[in-house]
Amino acid sequence: MGHSKNNELARLRQERGKSKATNGRKEKGRQRQVRFLIVCEGTKTEPYYFEALVQGSMSDVREVNVEGVGMGTVALIKETKAIKHDLEKKNNMQFDRVWVVFDKDGFQDFNQAITMAKDLGYGSAWSNEAFELWYCLHFAYLNTAIKRSAYITMIENALKNKPGNNNFTYTKGDPDIYRLLQKYGDENMAKKHAEKLRKSFNNTNYAAHNPCTMVDKLVDELQHPERFLRTTP
């Protein structure tokens, strides 16, 4: 496509901003918004996905900031804390929900990062082994530990079987992946698959929970922010 990947992310944010502005003009007296901060390990793959998700499921009670910082696990948690502080101070506001998005990769401090995030009150949309596991679960249940490259093969095979996608090749940071998953995959099934995977583990050694993901939890919150409002004064 003609745009660079950075321009594509900017375009998604600009379009979402226009939609929010239009909704804002229509509803001056709308109810309080739930403010989300999502800080991702990756600078393209995860931010593109969540920006597209937010744009595709507009809500008058949700405000979302998505950041991609290029660092993982404990370093990501520390950076998230700094980003949260800076944005809240700059904009004179507070985030209601903070989420971190990261993969297991080869990080030895994976469990520590999850614990640290929990202690800070952050949600962790972690994946073991990689974020692309969430994509795979849109097409099939997967409970066998496989290499990251095998996730890619699964995604490509699933989409190549769909009309008009015979030559599909997956690339990290593909800004079109959310649309393809919505068109050809089954998000509700993916959520059920993710929950089933979690129930198959009965300990808190998350580094050994392979495959497993918490991405569906964040997706669900973004799609239903009104649930948070019902639990707060």
What role is predicted for each listed range?
Residues 1-34, 52-67, 88-97, 104-233:
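C-terminal accessory helical subdomains adjacent to catalytic cores in phosphodiester-
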Residues 42, 46, 69-77, 210-214:
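Phosphate/oxyanion-binding active-site loops and adjacent basic polyanion-contact surfaces
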Residues 77-81, 98, 110:
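Generic internal hydrophobic packing segments that stabilize the cores of diverse globular domains
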